[in-house]
Amino acid sequence: IWHRGAVDADGKSGDGAGIQIEIATDFFKEKIISSGQTPDETKRICVGMVFLPRTDYAGQEKCREIIESVLLEENYHIYGWRQVPFNSKVLGKTAEQSRPEIAQVMFKKNENLKTNDLERDLFETRKKIEKLARENQLKNFYICSFSSRSIVYKGMFLAEMLAEFYPDLNDQKLTSRFAIFHQRYSTNTFPSWDLAQPFRTLAHNG
C-alpha cells in the first residue's frame, strides 16, 4: 500500500507509518530481566511507548518524573525504562530534525484486575499523566500506547522502512496474534511523529 502514503521532497520522510501489535510477553520479560528486575509471573506486563523531547533534557527528565510519580500513585510497580533501538539512517532530513527520544516504560499493577478493568485503569492513569504534562507546559511529549494488551511502533518514515527503523520488529521473540498497519496521507494537518498512525485504539483514513 505504499502508493497510499505521501513522501516529502527529501524522498525519505513520510507522512507517517506504524503498526499496532500485541505485547509480546517473552520479549518484554527478557528486557525486564536484563534491566535487573524479575517479572511477576502472576501479573500482566504493561508497556508505555512514549515520545519524549529529544533536545530538551530537563523537559525529558520532567516527563519521566511525571510518568513515574503517577504510576506509583496509582499503585503500579515500575520495572524500568528502556531506550528503544532505532536506525536513523532510514530517515529523511525532515523526519530526523523532528525525531523525538523514543522510550518504553515497563510496569505492572500491584493489585489483581481483570484485563478490561486493567485497561480502563491504564486509560485513566494515562490521562492523568497527560494532564500533568500540559500543566507543566511540556512540549514534544506524546504517549503512543499505554497498555497491557498492545503496543504501537510508529514514526515519520516510509512504510517499507518501519522494520528497518525499529529493529525490535525483526526480533523473533516479538510475536503477535494480530497486527494493525497504517500509512498516512496527510491532508489538512502537517505531518508529525505523533500524528503518525495507528493511534492507541484506532487507525483510519478519514
Feature annotation, model-predicted:
Residues 1-205:
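N-terminal segments that mediate ammonia production and transfer
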